[in-house]
Amino acid sequence: MVARGASIDVDGVYSNPAGLAFLPKDGFHLSLTGQSAYQTREIHASTPLWTQDGNITEKYYKGTASAPLIPSFHGAYKRDNWVISAGFAITGGGGKASFDNGLPMFDAMAAGLIAQQSQGLVTPSMYDINTAMDGKQYIYGVQLGLSYKINDWLSVFAGGRMNYVKSGYEGYLIAKMKESYGGKTLADLQLKCDQSGWGLTPIIGIDAKLGRWNLAAKYEFKTNLNIENKTDKLLVPDGVPESVLKPYADGEQTPSDIPAYLSVAAGYEILPNLRASVEYHFFDDKRAGMLNDRQKTLTHGTHEYLAGIEWDIVKMLTVSGGFQKTSYGLSDDFQTDTSFYCSSYSLGFGARARLSEAWSIDIAYFWTNYEDYEKSSDNYNGTGMPGTDVYSRTNKVFGLSLNYQF
């Protein structure tokens, strides 16, 4: 079920940690999950800069990311009213994307510099650009916490998550005159920059069981986090502004806070074998520090709305489905080629097969449809020419979990 914030199960280590105190059996509850994800990020860039002949032309850029295995682990030990829980997962970041034909921001920078330095005598039809760019960001999280059942209907949780961020960029751009014009190199850009940092997230939670209702909430405090560059290569043409170079300079530290996060959920038992839930998430992005105070350009934090239903067809088989709507407070100043977001809705479907009293298997599929985001500027990437970028994404995830309790 997509909306897991009020569920009482081993995955509550992340989604509803206070609810772990209401697990029906004492002992160990363990879950090992593997996810397989496929994502694309696409940019349609339209500007007269590409031809400089008075016509607006479009270039298409596509980044792909494929992760055949994304592992995670949830574990809890319950004894009487107490539960100690732990988990490991990739809790954030955009994964890795490879743009085989580069990014428009670097193409535009090269085209603008060539036009400026040649005083317009060298036009795009006279040279070729060979470029590629890879970007990655992963947030690895290790969580530990304690849940306590105060009475028959109320429980609480306190804990924390240690986050380690690993990100970076690697790519190149070489612009050369065509052989018919002599083959001279006009621009050479080389970049290899790794980034890392860590931070601690305090977490609290509460769960209330009221008859057929289960109400739950979780709050993750803002994580103060700086990432530091380890730059092995930073070669750029003369004339590139300092503001472009600074984010990739060796030793440079960049704010990259993880925003505070609130989850509120309600689950209802319609029938003994039929349950439904609704859930709301808020990410306080506007108060999470970013490079150049980029967060201040957002119009609001991120809102997510979720709903789900699950049905025990027979004792040994449960099926589920759900919906998620994600709304970002995006602005043109916030969106960049190396980090852009799109509001979306998602559909998820899953099933659990109970192999025995101790063993069960979960299987799930999650599909996301993104809204295009259009960004227009009269000074496209600082070139003095107009231009428009249309950002879009796709995402498909398949998951499989093996659960064991004893």
Give a label for each model feature.
Residues 1-93, 340, 366:
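N-terminal, post-signal peptide beta-strand-biased segments of exported outer-membrane/organellar beta-barrel
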Residues 3-8, 25, 70-406:
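Outer-membrane beta-barrel porins/channels
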